[in-house]
Amino acid sequence: MTSQVRQNFHQDCEAAINRQINLELYASYVYLSMAYYFDRDDQALHNFAKFFKNQSHEEREHAEKLMKVQNQRGGRIFLQDVKKPEKDEWGSGVEALESSLQLEKSVNQSLLDLHKVCSEHNDPHMCDFIETHYLDEQVKSIKELGDWVTNLRRMGAPQNGMAEYLFDKHTLGKEST
């Protein structure tokens, strides 16, 4: 059944939004895996766990926001299977942050691709939505993760376990307060 509210909403934009929803849910799933990995007794980096759990929640919210706009525009949501994370063991904190950085960069590229599709189909509403709610936040997140990886490497991580312990306690501990 065709939506009565659909206006200036190309099928390519609708399909690209559905792909982005799936990617955001995948990112949420990856971060959830990371969170509970660092919560294990043999890792015990509780602020890493808390950070990744918050990231998981944020990515799920991104997916839900896209679902809401899909409905508002008269599109249809077609959920796909969410791929399992690439790994079950995330290694050290710095290795997990490097994986997180790569994930955020791929999410950002996908958002840029979505923006391009919407722009090519003259959909200023969707372009504005992506710019307002996603792109700036992605750039800030990528910068923060890059800075953290640099600082952890500077302190000798992952070979120096004290570096990750102090980072967990002082840097990520401040993030969660």
Curated annotation (Swiss-Prot):
Stores iron in a soluble, non-toxic, readily available form. Important for iron homeostasis. Has ferroxidase activity. Iron is taken up in the ferrous form and deposited as ferric hydroxides after oxidation. Residues 7-156 form the Ferritin-like diiron domain. Its EC number is 1.16.3.1. Disulfide bonds: none annotated. GO terms for molecular function: ferric iron binding; ferrous iron binding; ferroxidase activity. It comes from the Eukaryota. PROSITE patterns: FERRITIN_1, FERRITIN_2, FERRITIN_LIKE. Keywords: Iron, Iron storage, Metal-binding, Oxidoreductase. Liver, gonads, head kidney, heart and spleen. GO terms for cellular component: cytoplasm. It comes from Salmo salar. GO terms for biological process: intracellular iron ion homeostasis; iron ion transport; negative regulation of ferroptosis. Pfam families: Ferritin (PF00210). InterPro entries: Ferritin, Ferritin-like, Ferritin-like_diiron, Ferritin-like_SF, Ferritin_CS, Ferritin_DPS_dom. Belongs to the ferritin family. This is Ferritin, heavy subunit. It catalyses: 4 Fe(2+) + O2 + 4 H(+) = 4 Fe(3+) + 2 H2O. Fe cation 1 binds at E24, E59, H62. Oligomer of 24 subunits. There are at least two types of subunits. The functional molecule forms a roughly spherical shell with a diameter of 12 nm and contains a central cavity into which the insoluble mineral iron core is deposited. Fe cation 2 binds at E59, E104, Q138.
